[in-house]
Every structure is written in structure tokens, then in C-alpha cells.
């Protein structure tokens, strides 16, 4: 097939390479494969060569084996035994390789001539038979099963036969080529075929491998030669057929062309004869236009004829330049010019001959003349006037213009008058002669013979006389015509050629012996030819018209034609008959003249003799006439045979031409087919290339998509890591806020106690101190649960509100029952900016509100003493009315929060004194510093035992359009707070104190056991989930931290109400806490929100993954107060240690996961990580700069961790005054206190529950530390509100130098609302688009823009 040509060429080239390497078996297989694909040139020779070399190699190997065996036999017995074993092994293997049946089947396939015989099928077989037979033979002849020689070739032959016969088109073509007709086979052939199948070889000769191979090879060669001969014969036959068809077609085309040419010539001649053209004379402008026929006009334009004008009798002609084909019109003056002229074209400039043509057309005579030829001698000179042309004059033309007038050449030519009269006379004479002959015959029958002879002689004489008279009359008439027809003579005699045929000379007889010179006759009605004395000229018939004759104008230099070139057989026979008739007439005339002369001389006696002599002469004449007739017949017959022979030759030539044409057409058709196949193949290649290009483009696009997806995944992972860090910070902040609330509760209780103590001191100063001691002892005797034991994550996180860093105005709270009342407040944004109060007067006394900040500049070290108002007042912003209302929160959902605090009565007394005497406080504080510092160790050691019961505040937030509303339960009055900046804060704090009822110890132990079981189950589930996640992340190389899952799966607080005002039924609370029951309600009154709380637990020691588990451990409620008295601290320590160990393990796992993830990112995107590292370096530099700036800006530079005593806080407050000595003392005291705080931190970690906080979660920019402190610590924090800085919320950028500080974390807040659960999240970016700078307040009364 044509499509497999390239593969065949490749196989051929590979076979040649293996042939050069002397690997003949492989080369032979490749050659056969290439031939099967497409029979290329020279493939058969290569196959035969490879087979020959393979046979030689096999024979050489056999000879070598035989020689080796002989040598081994002669060497001795020892060497003979292994050789015999080898020979037997080889023979055994050779015998076992193939059987006789296998060899016979392969030989039968190779010996078969047709594909039908190869498959042992009939010609009329079906496709099913072909497939069945092919499968059966393929199993027998497959090279893996049949090891006989040439089995592989036989298998290939079967395969080729199956491919051809299974395809219907190829099968038909094969049948046509090999002339296989599907006819029913004879019984004899079938019997032979069956015998061959049963017994393929009749003789009992055993074939060896070599003989079988040689026979098969010779048979194959013979078969190939036969096929080649058949192909050559078919090709030759096709070529001959094509040549015959081409010759026939060419002959047919030539005949059609000749016919078309003849028709065109006739049409042109008719058009030329029927048209006339007017020509202007260039010799004189006064000459009228010359009317000329189309033929003459064409000759005139070509330059073959010059026209002689009628009026001026001057010539004009056209001359052409041979080089540039430019035409020049010459007048009569150029006759005298002898030299040539130059061409006037600028590109030519060659000489142009000025010679006039040899032919002249006379307008008057309307005839053409030959210049330079002699006139005949018989022509007399011209005398008289030249007759006018046949055209009517111009005057008569105008009159006769209306009448149609035919051209002259189209009118039938009439005989002249004298010829008509002559013909009438001849007819009359003939009639008279006939009458006389009839009379003579009648007389001869009655008279004697002499009378008959006389009558005959008289009759002959009369006929001779009439013939002579007729000839004389014709000559006289012609002479008169010749006198009438004028001749023009110039320097040389010119012959006149007339249009009328009657004027041609015909007086001379064909038997005239006078010598005549040949002359050229040129006329529009006759073809030119030369006349000689042997040639005859016939007169035209009267009815012959010039229109029917051929008009061929030729130049004078053209050679004349012979009669054989222009006359046919019929014309020659007619001429011969005329010549014979003339001869008879002449003979009769001669005989009659002689007889008359004799009769005059002799006597009439001898009349009989004369008659006999006349008879003899007549007989001779008859014989001669018959001889001439016979001669003419023979000549006609020979000519007819010659004509037929020529026709046959022409017919054969036409056939050959048609064959050649058909051959050429066939070649062209084959070329076109090959060209179309080539185009189709190129198109297929182009389509394949396009498909490959599309696949490549798709692959590239997929790779790009994968790369982009991978980059996006990496970016998303980085973003997730950043989010996780932010979430951890947020959780830390939330814990800090909760501790703030707890500290605020402690502060409120202490504040109430201080009020009671002040009232008692006024009544009885001596008894007040003792009463306070008794109260403290009672509180110590009733131990409470520590704050760290309760899970902080049960309650929702508080947003990073600026309320914790800014002053709050609270309205007077009206309480009917201090144990059951609920106080609430709201913080709202003011639409209009209001004047910010001075640092010393943020909360005025006229509004009856207590402030959490320090007092004015005059009394900077005083402690705030809020007074409880009797009547509530509401501060409302009219510009921002409230839109939403909060529903009441059920008391069942409120949980107690138990905090550990250190109570020091001495510190309280000092604080009270500081409020009264501002000036004396400096000295008192200095004196008390040493005393209080000595008591630090004792106070710190008693932290674990001194427990105080406080109630945790339940917070809920709602926001929409930067506004918030809340209602107090008993009074239903709204309270607002005003801020100096434009930040949005919406918060509602519902503080409700509950008298907790504690259950028995046994119930708590049962609950604790169940909780431990649940923890173990949860840990197992978490481990299983981690394994599944690690298996999933192996393919994708992406790991999501567990912190995000646990944080995202944490349920909302049950007290938070949805935006659709739906009450929360506490389902999550009941599910998360095992065996939780409704808690008894206890009430207490709180009036303030604390700014910060001190912390002692570091984030590095606690892992956030176990935070929820810890929360579940301590989410149950308690009913009995006696339980806490007997609660052992040892059990708590063990439980905490176990939790810490588990947390540390999970922390290590998280670190390992993060490290592995970071390594993958570093490997895959090293370039991006380097850029990020550079950015981080720049950020670290900026952080260092920010820290330095913060240290400079802060008024105090002392930072303390852990439990800070009252002395530390008082010292910090005294730093604001101008006391240099105090600052030195404070620094020393702080250093001592730091050591004690470290010890307290260690003790608290052992005795308290782990809380997820940072080392310094809520550190102020002024340097004051936050943590679990005493009551006075909270007061000091409230005093330090004037030193709080506010930042630009629109930018939302965290100060990188103060990540560990509280206000650096609490820069800006973004509260997000999530459907009904209303999860509150804190982020470091604000949604506000406006950039606003906020003022910074200091105690030195300086205002600066940050």
C-alpha cells in the first residue's frame, strides 16, 4: 500500500544495516517485511542475496561440524566419547525440533501459486471460510510452534493471503490481475486437490532440511519470475492499449480540426466575398474613397498588394518593419527611392525596405496585376477608352441608395450575349443534322450502296463544314472579346487577369504541338498552377458560378501545384473522356478529308474498296478507343486501390495515435492519483501534527494549572499558618480578658469591703481593723476554687475592645436586691466627634460615676474611690439611637468563675490613706516599701491557700451598623458610654452573681472518673484522626493544624443570642459537660470592668490542642461548699501534671508537623522563602526600632511578671511624681520581687489548672505587668489608663516591636457575625476605610499624634 511506503523504506534500511553486520536471518526477515508493506525497488534482489548468504553460512557451519567430528574420531577413544554424545544430542534436538507433517505443510504453502491454494480454499469461498482456514493454518505454522525450515515464510505468506482475500476490493483486484474467474471447479481438479491435501507427496523420498530449503527456494524463484513476466506482459498490454487509444483519439481530433478549419475557411471566404471596405487615398486629399473587397483590403494591410487609385492614377501601399513589426504607409513618391529608410521607433532604429509589392490592384479594372511578367504575343495593344468599373457612379448611388444592391461577387455570373446566340445556332445545326441523317438512312435502305457512300460522304462533308464554321465563329468571338478587354502597359508588360472565366484562353486544342512558355495565373476564383503543352484546360460549364469555386490568393513566389496535388480521380477520368472524344472527332475529320481527296482523284468504281478501307480505319479507331477505355479503367482501378491502401494506412496511423493518446491519458491519470494520494498523506501528517501540538499544548496547560494550584496551595498553607498564629494570639487575648473580668470582680468585692471598712472606721476606728481581720479569716476558712481550675474556653472570646484601654462612664445602677439584681452597660460609637476630656477630668463627679483611671495631675498617686450612686442616670447619644434589644439571659446558663487572689489588709490600709493624703503618700510609700517587701515571701506562699470565691461575668456581643443596645433586667434603662476616638465598640456585660451549690465529694469523684474516661476516648479518636490525616497528606503534602480544627469546631457560648432574637437552649453546654445539672443562682453586684489582670502561666508550658479537653474536665457544676474544704490539693497537682505531660507531647507533635511542612515549602519554593526571610529580617529590624521607641515613649521602664504585691504597684505609681529616691527604691524592690514571682509562678503551675496564655499577654505600653495580682494591683491598673496610647485603626497594622504586649495585640478589632451561632472572632485588621489619627494622653499633660 502507498501509505506504508515509509515504513517499508525504514525496514529496508535496517535490513541493509544488519546485512552489513552479517546478521542474515534478521536482515532477511526485515527485507520480507518491507516487501510485504510495499514492494520497493531492488527488494527482491536483496532478499535473494540474503538467502544465498544464509545458505552459505549454514553449509559452512555444517561442514565445520562434520570436520570437527572427524578430527575428534581420529584423536582417540577419550576424545571420541564426548563427540559422539554431542552428535547424538544434536541429532536428537534436530529430530525433536520439527516433524514431517510440519515440514510438509510449510512446503505446500510455499509451493502454491495463488493465495487460494496457500489457504487451500476454493475460488467461491466466503469470508467465514477464509478466517476459519487461516486460524487453523496459523496454529500449525506459527514460528513458536513450528520449527521447520521456512515455516516463518510460510506463516507470512498465509498472513498476506488472508489480508488480501479478506478485503473485498483487494480480492477483486487480485482476481482480475491473475485472471481468476469464479467458476465451479471440475471433479477431477477437486479429486487432485483432495489427494494433495491427504497425501501432499506421493514418493517415499525423505527430505532433509537442506534439500527442502533448496527446492523451496528454487520454486520461489520460479514463482517470482513468472509473476514478473506476467506483470511485464500486463504492463506492455496496457501500454499498447493506451497507445492505440491515444492514436485513435489523436486521429479523430485531427479530423475534427480539419473539418473545423474547412468550415472556418468557407465562412471566411463567404464573408470576404460578401463584404467591401472603403480606403482613402493618401496621394491627394481630393480623391474620393476607394471601394475594395475584404480580401484585397486584407492583402493591402499585410503589404502584399499596392492599390492604384482611379482618379489620381497613383499607387499606395503598406510596409512592415521586420524587427519591431511597425507599419508604414507609403505613397507613390517612394517608387523613386532606391535606398532603405530607418525605422522611426526609438527602440528599433533599423532599416526598412521601401520596395513596393509585386502585385497591383487596379481600382478601375477591379483586377490584380503581376509586376515584371511578360504579356502573351497574341494580345493586341490597347486602343480606345478604358471602360468604367461595374460600380455605379456616385451620383447614381445616392439615387439608388434606397434600392438594395447586392455585391458583384455574390451575383451569379451570366453568359455574354454572343455566347447565347452561338449556343442557339449550334442547337439549330444539330437539329438539322439529325433530320438529314434520318433522311439519309431512309434513303439508304432503298438505294444502292454507292449512293449510300455518296450520301455518307456528303453527310461527313456537311458535318466537317459545320464544325469548321463553328470553330471559326468561336475564334472570331474570342478575338472580339480580347479586343474589348483592355490591357495596361508600363515600363514592363503586365498581364491582365480578369474575373470572368469565359475570357480565359481556350482556343488551343490539347493536341497542339507548338511550344508554349509556362506562365502564372492568379485569380480569386482559381487555384494557381502552371500550364504546359501536355496539360489541358477545360471550359467551365454555363451554370458554374464563382461563389462555388475556391478563392485562394497566393504570392507570386509560391511554387505552382501539379495536377496530382489538386485533382482527384473523378476529375482525371473526366479529362480523359474529353480527350478521347476530341481524338475521335479529329480522326473522323482526317479520314473524311482523305476519302474526299481520293474520290476526287480516283474513280467511283473503287468505292467499295474505299468503304472497306474506311471500315478498317473505323475498326482500328474503335479498337484504339476500347484500348484507351480499358487503359483508363485499369488506371482508375489502380488509383482506387492506391487510394484504399492510403486510407488503410491513415486509419492505422489514426489508431496508433489514439492508442498513444490513451496511453498518455492513462499516465496522466496515474500521476494525478499519485499526486492526490501524496496530498492526502500530507494532509494526514498535518492533522497528526496538529493533534500532537494540541496534546502538547494541553499538557503544558495542565502542568501550568498544576503548578498554579500547587502555588496556591502553598500560599493557602502559609496563610493558614499565619491565621493559626493570629488565632493563638486571639485565644491568649481572650484568656487575658477573662482574667480581667475576674480581677474586676475581685476589685469590686474589695471595693465593697473597703466601703464597709471606711464606714466602720468612722464609727469605731479601733474595732474596724479587727472586724476586717475577722472577715478575712472567714473568707480563708471557706476556701474557693481557683480561677485557673475553670476552663476559660467554655465562654465566648471577648473582642479586642478599646474599652479595656480607655475610660468608661457608667450610669448609676439602681438595685432592688443586691443578691439578685443584674447590672448591664453598653458602649456605643458617637456619630459626631466630641471634645475629649482632659487627662485629669475624664470622669466628672457631677455625673455620679466612678472612673477606672487615675485622678488629676495634682493628685496623681491617689487611689480611685468610686461611690455608689442612689439613682441611676443614663448617658445617651442622640445621634446614634439604638435599634436592637437583647433578650434576657437565663440564670441557668451563667457559670461561676473561681479565681485565686492574694489579700493583704496592710496594703488596703495603705491604699485608703493614699486617697486622703496625696502629699504624705510619697513618704508613707517609701517607708512601707521595705516592710511590704519583707512580707512578699509569706504572701506568695499563701497564694494556694488563700482562695476567694468570685463570679465570672458572662459576656455577649451583638453588632450591626456600628451600634449596640442592652437593657437592665429590673430597670430596663439604657446606658451609653462616650469615647474620644471613632472606633466601634459594641459590648454588653451581663454580670450575675450566683450562690453556687456544691455537691458531695462522691458525686464529684464519679463525675471526675467519667470525665477521665471521656478524655481517654477523645485522645484515642484524635490519634486515629491524626493517622488518617497523615496518610492523606502524604499524596498532597499538605497538613492542616489541629488547632484550627479544634478552634473551628468549638461551639458558641450558650448565653449569646442570635441576630434573629432566638433564645439559646444550652444544648452544647449540656452535651460537652458530662452529667451537668442546673446550677443554683447566686447574686452579687458588680459595677466596673477591669483593665487588665496579672498572669503567672506562660504559653510555652501549655499547648492549645488540649485546651478544649481541659475545658471539658472542668465544665461541670458544683452544689456543695463543704466539698472544697476537703478537696485535696495533691489530686489537683497530679491531674495537672498528667495534663501538662500530654500537652507537651502534642506540642512536640505539632512542632514536628510544622517543621516538616516548612521543609517541604523550602524545597519547593526556595526562592519565595528567601524573599520572605529577607522581609522577616527587615521586620525584625523594625521591631527593634519599635521597641526602642516604645521604651523611650513609656514613662516607666520596669516590667514585672507574676504576682505583684501592693508595694510594687505603689512604687510604680510614685514613679509618676518627681521623687528620684522612690524610683531607685522601686527598682531594687522590683528586682527582689521578680525573683519571688518566679517562684510563685512555679508553685502556681503545680497547684493550678493550665490556662492558654502568653508570657505577657496583656502588657501595657507604660511597662506595667499584668497577671493574677491583688486588689490594689487592679486599682493601680485603673490609675494607669491615662498613659494608654491609641493607634490608627484604619491601617490595622500591629506594632511589630510589641507583639508580647497587650495593647500591641489589641490594636484593632473586627467582629464577624456567623449565622445563628454568632461566633466572635478577633483579627488584627479593621474594616474601616477612613484613616484617623488618635491622640495620646500622658500624665505630663502632653498631647502628641502617633
Curated annotation (Swiss-Prot):
Domain J: 114-178
Region (Disordered): 57-92, 214-239, 371-570, 746-949, 1026-1090, 1173-1301, 1319-1346
Biased composition (Acidic residues): 1289-1301
BP GO annotations: cellular response to misfolded protein; chaperone cofactor-dependent protein refolding
Signal sequence annotation: none
Cellular component GO terms held in the UniProt record: endoplasmic reticulum membrane
Coiled coil regions in record: 214-275, 577-742, 999-1034, 1131-1194
Composition-biased stretches (Low complexity): 221-234, 403-485, 526-551, 756-782, 843-862, 899-947, 1195-1243, 1263-1279
GO molecular-function terms, A-Z: Hsp70 protein binding
Ranges of Basic and acidic residues composition bias in the record: 746-755, 1173-1190
Annotated Polar residues bias: 508-517, 552-566, 812-824, 863-882, 1068-1089, 1244-1259, 1336-1346
Keywords: Coiled coil
InterPro entries in the cross-refs: DnaJ_domain, DnaJ_domain_CS, DnaJ_subfamily_B/C, J_dom_sf, TPR_rpt
Name listed for the protein in its UniProt record: J domain-containing protein DDB_G0295729
Amino acid at each position: 500500500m502507498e501509505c506504508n511506503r515509509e515504513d517499508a523504506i525504514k525496514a529496508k534500511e535496517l535490513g541493509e544495516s544488519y546485512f552489513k553486520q552479517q546478521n542474515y536471518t534478521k536482515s532477511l526477515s526485515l527485507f520480507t517485511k518491507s516487501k510485504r508493506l510495499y514492494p520497493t525497488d531492488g527488494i527482491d534482489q536483496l532478499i535473494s542475496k540474503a538467502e544465498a548468504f544464509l545458505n552459505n553460512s549454514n553449509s559452512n557451519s555444517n561442514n565445520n561440524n562434520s570436520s570437527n567430528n572427524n578430527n575428534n574420531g581420529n584423536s582417540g577413544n577419550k576424545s571420541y566419547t564426548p563427540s559422539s554424545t554431542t552428535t547424538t544430542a544434536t541429532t536428537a534436538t534436530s529430530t525433536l525440533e520439527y516433524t514431517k507433517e510440519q515440514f510438509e505443510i510449510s512446503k505446500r504453502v510455499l509451493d502454491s501459486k495463488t493465495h487460494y491454494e496457500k489457504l487451500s480454499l476454493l475460488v467461491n469461498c466466503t469470508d467465514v471460510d477464509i478466517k476459519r482456514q487461516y486460524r487453523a493454518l496459523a496454529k500449525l505454522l506459527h514460528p513458536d510452534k513450528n520449527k521447520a525450515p521456512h515455516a516463518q515464510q510460510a506463516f507470512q505468506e498465509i498472513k498476506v493471503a488472508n489480508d488480501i482475500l479478506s478485503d473485498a476490493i483487494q480480492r477483486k483486484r487480485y482476481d482480475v490481475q491473475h485472471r481468476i474467474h469464479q467458476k465451479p471447479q471440475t471433479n477431477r481438479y477437486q479429486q487432485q486437490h483432495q489427494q494433495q491435501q491427504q497425501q501432499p507427496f506421493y514418493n517415499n523420498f525423505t527430505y532433509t532440511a537442506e534439500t527442502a530449503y533448496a527446492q523451496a527456494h528454487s520454486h520461489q524463484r520460479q514463482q517470482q519470475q513468472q509473476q514478473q513476466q506476467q506483470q511485464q506482459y500486463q504492463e506492455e498490454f496496457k501500454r499498447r492499449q493506451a497507445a492505440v487509444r491515444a492514436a485513435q483519439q489523436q486521429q479523430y481530433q485531427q479530423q475534427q480540426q480539419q473539418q473545423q478549419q474547412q468550415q472556418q475557411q468557407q465562412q471566411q471566404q463567404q464573408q470576404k466575398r460578401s463584404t467591401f471596405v472603403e480606403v482613402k487615398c493618401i496621394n491627394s486629399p481630393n480623391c474620393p474613397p476607394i471601394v475594395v473587397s475584404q480580401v484585397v483590403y486584407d492583402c493591402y494591410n499585410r503589404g502584399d498588394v499596392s492599390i492604384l487609385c482611379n482618379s489620381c492614377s497613383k499607387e499606395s501601399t503598406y510596409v512592415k518593419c521586420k524587427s519591431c513589426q511597425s507599419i508604414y504607409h507609403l505613397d507613390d513618391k517612394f517608387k523613386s527611392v532606391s535606398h532603405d529608410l530607418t525605422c522611426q521607433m526609438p527602440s528599433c532604429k533599423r532599416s526598412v525596405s521601401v520596395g513596393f509589392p509585386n502585385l497591383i490592384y487596379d481600382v478601375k479594372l477591379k483586377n490584380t496585376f503581376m509586376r515584371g511578367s511578360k504579356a502573351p504575343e497574341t494580345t493586341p495593344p490597347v486602343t480606345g477608352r478604358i471602360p468604367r468599373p461595374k460600380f455605379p457612379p456616385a451620383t447614381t448611388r445616392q439615387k439608388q441608395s434606397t434600392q438594395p444592391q447586392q455585391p458583384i461577387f455574390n451575383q451569379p455570373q451570366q453568359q455574354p450575349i454572343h455566347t447565347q446566340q452561338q449556343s442557339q445556332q449550334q442547337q439549330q445545326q444539330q437539329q438539322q443534322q439529325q433530320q438529314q441523317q434520318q433522311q439519309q438512312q431512309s434513303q439508304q435502305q432503298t438505294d444502292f450502296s454507292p449512293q449510300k457512300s455518296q450520301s455518307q460522304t456528303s453527310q461527313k462533308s456537311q458535318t466537317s463544314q459545320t464544325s469548321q464554321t463553328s470553330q471559326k465563329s468561336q475564334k472570331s468571338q474570342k478575338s472580339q472579346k480580347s479586343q474589348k478587354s483592355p490591357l495596361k502597359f508600363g515600363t514592363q508588360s503586365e498581364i491582365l487577369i480578369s474575373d470572368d472565366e469565359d475570357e480565359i484562353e481556350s482556343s488551343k486544342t490539347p493536341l497542339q504541338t507548338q511550344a508554349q512558355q509556362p506562365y502564372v495565373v492568379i485569380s480569386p476564383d482559381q487555384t494557381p498552377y502552371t500550364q504546359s503543352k501536355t496539360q489541358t484546360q477545360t471550359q467551365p460549364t454555363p451554370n458554374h458560378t464563382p461563389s462555388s469555386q475556391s478563392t485562394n490568393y497566393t504570392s507570386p513566389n509560391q511554387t505552382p501545384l501539379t495536377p496530382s496535388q489538386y485533382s482527384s480521380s473523378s476529375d482525371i477520368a473526366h479529362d480523359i473522356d474529353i480527350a478521347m472524344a476530341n481524338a475521335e472527332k479529329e480522326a473522323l475529320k482526317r479520314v473524311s478529308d482523305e476519302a474526299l481527296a481520293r474520290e476526287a482523284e480516283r474513280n467511283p468504281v473503287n468505292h467499295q474498296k474505299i468503304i472497306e478501307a474506311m471500315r478498317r480505319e473505323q475498326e482500328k479507331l474503335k479498337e484504339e478507343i476500347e484500348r484507351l477505355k480499358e487503359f483508363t479503367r485499369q488506371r482508375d482501378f489502380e488509383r482506387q486501390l492506391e487510394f484504399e491502401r492510403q486510407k488503410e494506412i491513415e486509419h492505422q496511423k489514426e489508431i496508433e495515435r489514439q492508442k498513444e493518446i490513451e496511453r498518455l491519458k492513462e499516465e496522466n491519470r496515474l500521476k494525478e492519483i499519485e499526486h492526490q494520494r501524496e496530498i492526502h498523506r500530507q494532509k494526514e501528517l498535518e492533522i497528526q501534527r496538529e493533534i500532537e501540538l494540541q496534546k502538547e499544548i494541553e499538557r503544558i496547560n495542565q502542568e501550568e494549572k498544576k503548578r498554579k494550584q500547587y502555588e496556591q496551595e502553598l500560599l493557602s498553607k502559609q496563610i493558614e499558618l499565619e491565621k493559626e498564629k493570629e488565632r493563638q494570639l486571639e485565644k491568649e487575648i481572650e484568656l487575658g480578658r477573662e482574667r480581667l473580668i475576674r480581677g474586676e470582680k475581685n476589685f469590686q468585692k474589695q471595693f465593697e469591703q473597703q466601703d464597709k471598712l471606711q464606714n466602720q472606721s468612722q464609727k469605731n476606728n479601733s474595732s474596724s481593723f479587727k472586724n476586717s481581720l475577722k472577715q478575712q479569716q472567714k473568707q480563708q476558712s471557706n476556701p474557693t476554687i481557683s480561677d485557673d481550675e475553670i476552663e476559660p474556653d467554655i465562654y465566648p472570646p471577648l473582642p479586642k475592645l478599646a474599652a479595656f484601654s480607655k475610660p468608661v462612664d457608667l450610669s448609676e445602677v439602681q438595685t432592688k436586691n443586691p443578691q439578685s439584681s443584674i447590672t448591664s452597660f453598653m458602649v456605643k460609637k458617637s456619630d459626631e466627634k466630641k471634645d475629649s476630656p482632659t487627662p485629669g477630668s475624664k470622669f466628672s463627679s457631677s455625673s455620679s460615676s466612678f472612673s477606672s483611671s487615675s485622678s488629676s495631675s495634682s493628685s496623681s498617686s491617689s487611689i480611685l474611690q468610686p461611690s455608689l450612686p442612689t439613682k441611676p442616670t443614663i448617658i445617651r447619644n442622640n445621634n446614634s439611637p439604638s435599634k436592637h434589644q437583647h433578650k434576657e439571659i437565663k440564670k441557668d446558663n451563667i457559670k461561676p468563675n473561681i479565681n485565686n487572689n492574694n489579700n493583704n489588709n496592710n496594703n488596703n490600709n495603705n491604699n485608703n490613706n493614699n486617697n486622703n493624703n496625696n502629699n504624705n503618700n510619697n513618704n508613707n510609700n517609701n517607708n512601707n516599701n521595705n516592710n511590704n517587701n519583707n512580707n512578699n515571701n509569706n504572701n506568695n506562699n499563701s497564694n494556694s491557700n488563700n482562695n476567694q470565691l468570685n463570679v465570672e461575668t458572662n459576656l455577649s456581643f451583638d453588632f450591626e451598623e456600628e451600634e449596640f443596645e442592652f437593657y437592665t433586667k429590673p430597670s430596663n434603662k439604657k446606658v451609653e458610654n462616650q469615647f474620644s476616638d471613632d472606633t466601634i465598640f459594641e459590648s454588653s456585660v451581663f454580670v450575675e452573681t450566683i450562690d453556687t451549690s456544691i455537691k458531695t465529694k462522691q458525686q464529684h469523684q464519679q463525675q471526675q472518673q467519667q470525665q477521665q474516661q471521656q478524655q481517654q476516648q477523645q485522645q484515642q479518636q484524635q490519634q486515629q484522626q491524626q493517622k488518617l490525616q497523615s496518610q492523606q497528606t502524604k499524596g498532597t503534602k499538605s497538613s492542616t493544624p489541629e488547632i484550627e480544627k479544634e478552634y473551628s469546631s468549638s461551639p458558641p457560648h450558650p448565653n449569646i443570642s442570635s441576630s434573629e432574637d432566638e433564645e439559646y437552649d444550652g444544648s452544647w453546654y449540656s452535651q460537652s459537660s458530662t452529667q451537668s445539672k442546673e446550677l443554683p443562682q447566686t447574686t452579687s453586684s458588680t459595677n466596673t470592668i477591669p483593665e487588665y489582670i496579672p498572669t503567672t502561666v506562660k504559653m510555652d508550658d501549655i499547648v492549645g490542642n488540649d485546651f478544649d479537653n481541659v475545658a471539658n474536665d472542668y465544665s461541670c457544676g458544683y452544689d456543695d461548699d463543704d466539698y472544697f474544704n476537703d478537696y485535696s490539693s495533691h489530686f489537683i497537682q497530679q491531674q495537672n501534671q498528667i495534663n501538662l505531660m500530654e500537652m507537651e507531647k502534642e506540642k512536640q507533635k505539632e512542632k514536628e508537623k510544622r517543621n516538616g511542612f516548612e521543609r517541604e515549602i523550602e524545597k519547593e519554593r526556595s526562592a519565595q522563602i528567601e524573599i520572605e526571610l529577607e522581609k522577616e529580617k527587615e521586620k525584625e529590624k523594625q521591631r527593634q526600632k519599635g521597641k526602642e521607641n516604645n521604651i523611650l515613649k513609656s514613662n516607666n521602664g520596669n516590667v514585672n511578671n507574676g504576682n505583684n504585691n501592693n508595694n510594687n504597684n505603689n512604687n510604680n505609681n510614685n514613679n509618676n511624681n518627681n521623687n528620684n529616691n522612690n524610683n531607685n527604691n522601686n527598682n531594687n524592690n522590683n528586682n527582689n520581687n521578680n525573683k519571688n514571682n518566679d517562684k510563685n509562678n512555679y508553685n502556681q503551675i503545680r497547684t493550678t489548672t493550665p490556662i492558654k496564655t502568653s508570657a505577657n499577654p496583656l502588657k501595657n505600653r507604660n511597662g506595667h505587668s499584668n497577671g493574677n495580682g491583688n486588689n490594689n494591683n487592679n486599682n493601680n491598673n485603673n490609675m494607669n489608663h491615662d498613659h494608654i496610647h491609641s493607634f490608627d485603626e484604619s491601617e490595622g497594622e500591629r506594632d511589630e516591636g510589641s507583639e508580647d504586649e497587650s495593647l500591641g495585640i489589641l490594636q484593632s478589632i473586627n467582629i464577624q457575625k456567623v449565622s445563628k451561632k454568632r461566633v466572635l472572632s478577633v483579627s488584627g485588621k479593621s474594616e474601616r476605610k477612613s484613616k484617623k489619627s488618635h491622640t495620646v494622653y500622658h500624665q505630663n499633660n502632653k498631647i502628641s499624634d502617633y
